Swiss-Prot record:
Location in the cell: Membrane
Name of the protein in question: Interleukin-20 receptor subunit beta
Described purpose of this protein according to its UniProt entry: The IL20RA/IL20RB dimer is a receptor for IL19, IL20 and IL24. The IL22RA1/IL20RB dimer is a receptor for IL20 and IL24.
Gene: IL20RB
Cytoplasmic side: 255-311
Length: 311
């Protein structure tokens, strides 16, 4: 009987210890952790887009939600108990969170995530190593090279406002000089060079992020060629002749139009013969004086006047 009592005491002691040790992890967390915490936290960062990922918590037939919080350098050093909720990941369903808008400085960030199922909440899982955005992977930029007539045009993919592009271009020939141009944004066509007919031009580009002071690798070199030959001598001769004709015809046309306007506004009136002066004015004046004098000296008698009137 005594032995049986001792066995019962040992069983009760074992059950009590098992329950005690099972309760300790729950007491050490902020809330009762019934769900398992998310595991395998990592950050996939490409071209300044930061994605926190983790292994999903399995709950058959149930939807598990996740919450993400972060600490910047200041919080982790001076207020380690304060965590800031992520802008886009409060009770999200998927096992990932875009924390790009939360990572606003080039400093280490702590990230943590927990699962929620109804009233049950898991413990927090913390990213093993703090994340710094200067470790982002910069890919080679996509670009499209076109020719608009004799103009060399490039259009780079739009990677966001933080990206600039260093574009190198040159004429494909031995000893050609390489030119460099900084393009401030992508998504819009940019003129690089006026090309010569029959020549080929090559272009390559790389991205630059000023916030982290890093360049990507150069893209693959692409070349375009302008078909055709130089302007023929005959065409140049025709152009010269046409220019000379313009120099001659235009002044003549202006002069002719001026004459037409002059005649239309102030036409020339032809005088009748009776109004034309055939002798000099002085001679006419002298002739008129002689006639007056002759009339003044020739006085006829009344008989002569009557005879002249009858005849």
């Amino acid at each position: 009987m005594q032995t049986f009592t001792m066995v019962l005491e040992e069983i009760w002691t074992s059950l009590f210890m098992w329950f005690f040790y099972a309760l300790i992890p729950c007491l050490l967390t902020d809330e009762v952790a019934i769900l398992p915490a998310p595991q395998n936290l990592s950050v996939l960062s490409t071209n300044m887009k930061h994605l926190l990922m983790w292994s999903p918590v399995i709950a058959p037939g149930e939807t598990v939600y996740y919450s993400v919080e972060y600490q910047g350098e200041y919080e982790s050093l001076y207020t380690s108990h304060i965590w800031i909720p992520s802008s886009w990941c409060s009770l999200t369903e998927g096992p990932e969170c875009d924390v790009t808008d939360d990572i606003t400085a080039t400093v280490p960030y702590n990230l943590r995530v927990r699962a929620t199922l109804g009233s049950q909440t898991s413990a927090w899982s913390i990213l093993k190593h703090p994340f710094n955005r200067n470790s982002t992977i910069l890919t080679r930029p996509g670009m499209e090279i076109t020719k608009d007539g004799f103009h060399l045009v490039i259009e780079l993919e739009d990677l966001g406002p933080q990206f600039e592009f260093l574009v190198a271009y040159w004429r494909r020939e031995p000893g050609a000089e390489e030119h460099v141009k900084m393009v401030r944004s992508g998504g819009i066509p940019v003129h690089l060079e006026t090309m010569e007919p029959g020549a080929a031009y090559c272009v390559k580009a790389q991205t630059f992020v000023k916030a982290i002071g890093r360049y990507s690798a150069f893209s693959q070199t692409e070349c375009v060629e302008v078909q055709g030959e130089a302007i023929p001598l005959v065409l140049a001769l025709f152009a010269f002749v046409g220019f000379m004709l313009i120099l001659v015809v235009v002044p003549l046309f202006v002069w002719k139009m001026g004459r037409l306007l002059q005649y239309s506004c102030c036409p020339v009136v032809v005088l009748p013969d009776t109004l034309k002066i055939t002798n000099s004015p002085q001679k006419l004046i002298s002739c008129r004086r002689e006639e007056v004098d002759a009339c003044a000296t020739a006085v006829m008698s009344p008989e002569e006047l009557l005879r002249a009137w009858i005849s």
